[in-house]
């Protein structure tokens, strides 16, 4: 039976002439038809030939290849995004594996550091502390009325690079690009926001080109009151918004998530998204080895909000697999710069205190050190899994990895710190130190490792496997909150798409070319769980799938019809 593709309805727009060509969401450039050029006062403003989007994308790809540095490629792609968003997403989808590291990590780190230097065109919303009383007016200035996803940062903890001030805007822009490229969320529904509360980065304060508020960061009650003003203004403007907190400092990330997750549909990708993709990866890796996550002993290097968020989700998963909470917590060991977290360690943050080991249980350990180092922990715990979220390069030393491998034939090693310059150990070293036996997943992209004439592809434990699907699922289901169970369903769905589990070989995570398939599956699982949890209206499975299909945007030009304002 012959099938036909349903053609998108024509779009009625009031803009014309140069104004239309300057509107990134609507601009088609050389792809405007002869009729559209006549109807929208574009005749003579474009070259004669009417091109298809694929012809435009081919030209853009050739131009892209002419740039030699990753930051220049990033700037070029951002320029396309700011002039023709449909073409930008067609180009990125055509070359996702090549371009994802350019539009997001690791290249976005350099773009954040150089934000004021390479700034070209406004995108998103900048809300500075001196303008805090104009919050409602600022949000009313956003031209897109149907915003459904906001990614917001205050720029204080950008990747592993620290305080970048308003340069942190590069992260919400990049994240939302992946919501669209991987999760099919229309760019018209997205809004990047930076809360400009000053910066403690003296280099930025002294930089004559820095475009942010030149003031030390506000803190404590003033800071939280400012964030609350923002949240209330967002709720007033877009009551059904999905708000993603991004790259907030450890001291603020968890308090903000705790305070607002039941007030507005929100989540913190550094804490919950990282946890979801990591747990999904570990579920798949355990199944591929014929075991369960509950059977593994896990050591973390880095006990900040991200590391503790991953640990808590691992504990929740192993409880689902049958462990008691106490037994699940005894399998997880958190190490930070002061050593292993124990019940005798002072000044722990509340989210760290739940993850301590009891000193009474460590009396038999083979060590004479008062501070239990990562090597001490690895030597005594004999872990199956080692996870790095320290933001410090080189801390997974050869001695530590070899000690782990001595007791674990197939260790799982996950140096997750971003960007690449902050990774705890390179895949090349880990593979060599374990004689080719480690399963390695990283936070940043790495090329395959060649060791003793064998090729080892390296899985990237990228949050982009998770958050676009969560966003699509929330939009399609109309979920009012994001629950822990919705995040667990995302992890489980990701694990089900593992080539290593399904085929017995290949990467532990799906190929990037399949990421839209994975995102749609996660969207369905998240939407279904939202309905079961009572945070979304119950519908049939068919209706939920139809809602996902209806909300899945594709980078294709639509026919335009002229209308008045």
Swiss-Prot record:
GO terms for molecular function: malate dehydrogenase (decarboxylating) (NAD+) activity; malic enzyme activity; metal ion binding; NAD binding; oxaloacetate decarboxylase activity. PROSITE patterns: MALIC_ENZYMES. PANTHER family: MALIC ENZYME-RELATED, NAD-DEPENDENT MALIC ENZYME, MITOCHONDRIAL. It comes from Salmonella typhimurium (strain LT2 / SGSC1412 / ATCC 700720). It catalyses: (S)-malate + NAD(+) = pyruvate + CO2 + NADH; oxaloacetate + H(+) = pyruvate + CO2. This is NAD-dependent malic enzyme. The record marks 270 as: Important for activity. The keyword Metal-binding applies. Divalent metal cations. Prefers magnesium or manganese. The active site is at 104 (proton donor), 175 (proton acceptor).
């Amino acid at each position: 039976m012959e099938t036909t593709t349903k053609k998108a309805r024509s779009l009625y727009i009031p803009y014309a002439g140069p104004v239309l060509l300057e509107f990134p969401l609507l601009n088609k450039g050389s792809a405007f038809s002869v009729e559209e050029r006549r109807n929208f006062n574009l005749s003579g403003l474009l070259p004669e030939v009417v091109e298809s989007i694929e012809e435009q994308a081919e030209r853009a790809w050739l131009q892209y290849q002419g740039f030699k540095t990753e930051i220049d490629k990033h700037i070029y792609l951002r320029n396309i995004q700011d002039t023709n968003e449909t073409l930008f997403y067609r180009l990125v989808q055509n070359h996702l594996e090549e371009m994802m590291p350019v539009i997001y990590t690791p290249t976005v780190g350099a773009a954040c550091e150089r934000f004021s230097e390479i700034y070209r065109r406004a995108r998103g919303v900048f809300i500075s502390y001196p303008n805090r009383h104009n919050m409602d007016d600022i949000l009313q200035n956003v031209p897109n009325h149907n915003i459904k996803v906001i990614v917001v940062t205050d720029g204080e903890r950008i990747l592993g690079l620290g305080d970048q001030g308003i340069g942190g805007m590069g992260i919400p822009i990049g994240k939302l690009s992946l919501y669209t490229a991987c999760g099919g969320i229309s760019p018209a529904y997205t809004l990047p926001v930076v809360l400009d509360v000053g910066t403690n980065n003296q280099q930025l304060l002294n930089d004559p080109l820095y475009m942010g508020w030149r003031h030390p960061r506000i803190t404590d009650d003033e800071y939280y009151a400012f964030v609350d003003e923002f949240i209330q203004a967002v709720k007033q403007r877009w009551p059904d918004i999905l708000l993603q907190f991004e790259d907030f400092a450890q001291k603020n990330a968890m308090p903000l998530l705790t305070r607002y997750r039941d007030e507005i549909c929100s989540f913190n990708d550094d804490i919950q998204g990282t946890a979801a993709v990591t747990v999904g990866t570990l579920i798949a890796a355990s199944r591929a080895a014929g075991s369960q996550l509950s059977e593994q002993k896990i050591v973390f290097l880095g006990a900040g909000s991200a590391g503790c968020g991953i640990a808590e989700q691992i504990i929740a998963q192993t409880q689902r697999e049958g462990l008691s909470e106490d037994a699940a917590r005894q399998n997880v060991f958190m190490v930070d710069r002061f050593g292993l977290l124990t019940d005798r360690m002072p000044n722990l943050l509340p989210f760290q205190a739940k993850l301590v080991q009891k000193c009474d249980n460590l009396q038999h350990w083979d060590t004479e050190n008062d501070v239990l180092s990562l090597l001490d922990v690895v030597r005594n715990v004999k872990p199956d899994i080692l996870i790095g979220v320290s933001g410090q390069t080189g801390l997974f030393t050869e001695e530590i990895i070899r000690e782990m491998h001595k007791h674990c034939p197939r260790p799982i090693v996950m140096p997750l710190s971003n960007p690449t310059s902050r990774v705890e150990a390179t895949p090349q070293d880990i593979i060599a130190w374990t004689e080719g036996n480690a399963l390695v997943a990283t936070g940043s992209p790495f090329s395959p490792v060649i060791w003793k004439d064998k090729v080892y592809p390296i899985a990237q434990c990228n949050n982009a496997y998770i958050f676009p699907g969560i966003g699509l699922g929330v939009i399609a289901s109309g979920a009012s909150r994001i629950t822990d169970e919705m995040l667990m369903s995302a992890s489980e769905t990701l694990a089900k798409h593992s080539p290593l589990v399904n085929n017995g070989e290949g990467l532990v995570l799906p190929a990037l070319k399949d990421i839209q398939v994975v995102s749609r599956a996660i969207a369905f699982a998240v939407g279904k769980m939202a309905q079961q949890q009572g945070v979304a209206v119950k519908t049939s499975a068919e209706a939920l799938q139809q809602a996902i299909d209806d909300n899945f945007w594709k980078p294709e030009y639509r026919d335009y019809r002229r209308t008045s304002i």
